[in-house]
Design a protein with these regions (language model features):
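Short linear sequence motif anchored by a di-proline
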Residues: 1-150
Length: 150
């Protein structure tokens, strides 16, 4: 379900981890073409109107479960993402980093406006060879193309 990301800005490499309340992702907004760093999801202790967590299941998006938040499509412009084996709370979970291919981005939903904006990474079933790591996987999309959740 990607608990960590790696993004580059000029010569700087940023490692971003969801548990950090200051976690933000560089997101290219589809409608405006503007690239902004947007806070990643909402943690349990954070106020706000968006759902808790930092992910949106593709099946829920497609069935209309996110419509009440009036999401906008975004592309998470990251170079790598990290998946951890096992379940949250388990000790000594191994991290696995995966490259995002050139020209691809993470499919994202952006909700809210201004300071209340949040980004959620769209997830789907993992590739068969990685099912043993996690049951949810970030959805990769070619930047600027139609996908299953627009």
């Amino acid at each position: 379900m990607c608990g960590g990301l790696e993004a580059r800005e000029a010569d700087k490499v940023w490692k971003i981890y969801f548990p950090n309340p200051k976690a933000a992702i560089p997101v290219l907004l589809e409608e405006s073409g503007q690239l902004d760093w947007i806070p990643w999801g909402r943690r349990k202790e954070e106020p706000g109107n968006g759902p808790q967590g930092g992910w949106a299941r593709l099946s829920t998006v497609q069935s209309g479960g996110w419509e009440k938040y009036r999401p906008r499509r975004g592309f998470g412009m990251v170079q790598r993402y990290m998946e951890k084996e096992g379940r949250p709370g388990e000790k000594n979970r191994t991290s696995h980093w995966f490259d995002v291919p050139e020209g691809y981005a993470l499919e994202c939903l952006v909700i809210g406006e201004g300071e209340q904006q949040r980004v959620y990474i769209v997830t789907t079933a993992p590739p068969a060879e990685y099912e043993w790591i996690h049951d949810r996987w970030p959805l990769l999309t070619v930047v600027g193309t139609e996908a299953g959740c627009s």
